[in-house]
A protein has these predicted regions:
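N-terminal Rossmann-like NAD(P) cofactor-binding subdomain of oxidoreductases
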Residues: 2-178
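Conserved active-site and cofactor/substrate-binding residues in soluble primary-metabolism enzymes
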Residues: 11, 15, 19, 80, ...
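C-terminal substrate-binding/catalytic lobe of Rossmann-fold NAD(P)-dependent oxidoreductases
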Residues: 18-73, 162-165, 169-170, 175-303
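Solvent-exposed amphipathic alpha-helical surface segments
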Residues: 27, 158, 212, 322-329
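Secondary-structure transition/capping residues
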Residues: 31, 93-96, 258-262, 326, ...
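Charged/polar, solvent-exposed surface patches and flexible loops
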Residues: 100-103, 207, 249-253, 317, ...
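Low-complexity, flexible helical/coil segments
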Residues: 121-127, 145-152, 176, 201-208, ...
């Protein structure tokens, strides 16, 4: 029987959207994608080089409305013909678009990114995959939420069975290497949003684990630094029982995590630029394995967190599960084998 082919739309061509398009192009055959459509709000002269590069690879790029850019397909033209939507806008735009998507009876599914909480079931690859199978709308949690949840998962168990409590400090880079809008000139501390959980990172981890019926006693704080390279997280995890395996053994058995003996984020970032597809690192987090503090029932340390590479991998996984892609486990294993590394 011939496998179904999908027409997909990437709505938003910022950092996440364009990086996602590159992944979809690379794995177009494996994901059974017939056509990739994309929507961009505006077309400036200095952006046309990249647009033309993507168009040369077969991506059909339209605009948000028929009147905004002449002679280009609009979102209105594309919505009736696509099977799946990768919502890559931010700052509440995706939540506004959800109202339209919910009226599309033919639409198999859609996913949105970290800032669009409430778009659907909060999701991260390797954590709650069973909860989004055949779900129409999924919210892929942020890159730093990925990092925090992955550390809890590897050291305390998939259901957090060995977690007593945890505290994490997220050290954020201020802006992607290719942008400048959100750069800061000095360290900026984030406001705690919850008197117990702290910043949105722990709130989002807690809410994601609620989809599994699991309580997550996690607190987080957040500081943004004048860096454009990688995030980092300092973790302090209190265990119910001491680890029965070494951290190295645990991480080796968790394909979404990686290790490094390097202390400089710029060195790790440069390796990703050289050897990662699209110059990116896709692990949920990279643990500084030679710098852990372990005492009885406590494990403390640092991990680097890639920018949006980890969320892109979860976004691809969400698509597979939402549309019930044929042989999705085998396809995802191939993608993970291609993109993930044991050490950096």
């Amino acid at each position: 029987m011939e496998k179904k082919k999908y027409k997909v739309l990437v709505n938003g061509m910022g950092n996440i959207g364009t990086s996602l398009i590159h992944l979809l192009l690379r794995y177009k055959n494996e994901l059974h994608i017939e056509q990739i459509y994309a929507v961009k709000r505006s077309f400036k002269d200095w952006q046309m080089t990249e647009i033309e590069m993507l168009q040369a690879q077969g991506v059909i790029i339209g605009t948000t409305s028929r009147s905004s850019v002449p002679n280009r397909p609009s979102l209105e033209d594309q919505l009736p013909i696509v099977d799946y939507i990768f919502e890559a806008t931010a700052n509440g735009v995706g939540l506004e678009n959800l109202n339209t998507y919910q009226t599309l009876d033919h639409l198999l599914g859609a996913s949105a990114q970290g800032s669009e909480k409430g778009f659907g079931t909060s999701f991260m690859a390797g954590i709650n995959e069973e909860k989004i199978k055949n779900q129409r709308f999924v919210h892929v949690v942020s890159c730093n939420t990925h990092g925090s949840a992955a550390l809890l998962n590897v050291f305390t168990g998939k259901g957090l069975e060995n977690l007593q409590s945890a505290d994490m400090v997220v050290v954020r880079r201020s802006e992607d290497i290719g942008n400048h809008q959100r750069l800061v000139s000095a360290n900026v501390v984030a406001r705690h949003l919850d008197p117990i959980a702290g910043t949105h990172h722990s709130i989002d981890v807690i809410d994601m684990y609620k989809t599994l019926g699991v309580e997550c006693p996690l607190t987080s704080s957040d500081i943004t630094t004048p860096s454009q390279l990688m995030h980092a997280v300092r973790f302090n995890i209190q265990l119910k029982e001491a680890l029965s395996e070494t951290p190295e053994e645990l991480i080796k058995n968790q394909p979404f995590l990686s290790m490094t003996k390097k202390f400089d984020s710029n060195v790790v970032f440069e390796l990703g630029r050289r050897y990662g597809f699209g110059g990116r690192i896709y692990e949920h987090a990279i643990v500084l394995i030679s710098n852990l503090l372990i005492s009885n029932k406590t494990i403390k340390g640092w991990a680097f967190v890639p920018q949006e590479g980890n969320t892109l991998l979860s976004t691809i996984r969400a698509f597979m599960l939402q549309v019930s892609l044929t042989d999705h486990d085998a396809v995802f294993l191939k993608i993970k084998t291609d993109l993930l590394k044991e050490q950096w």
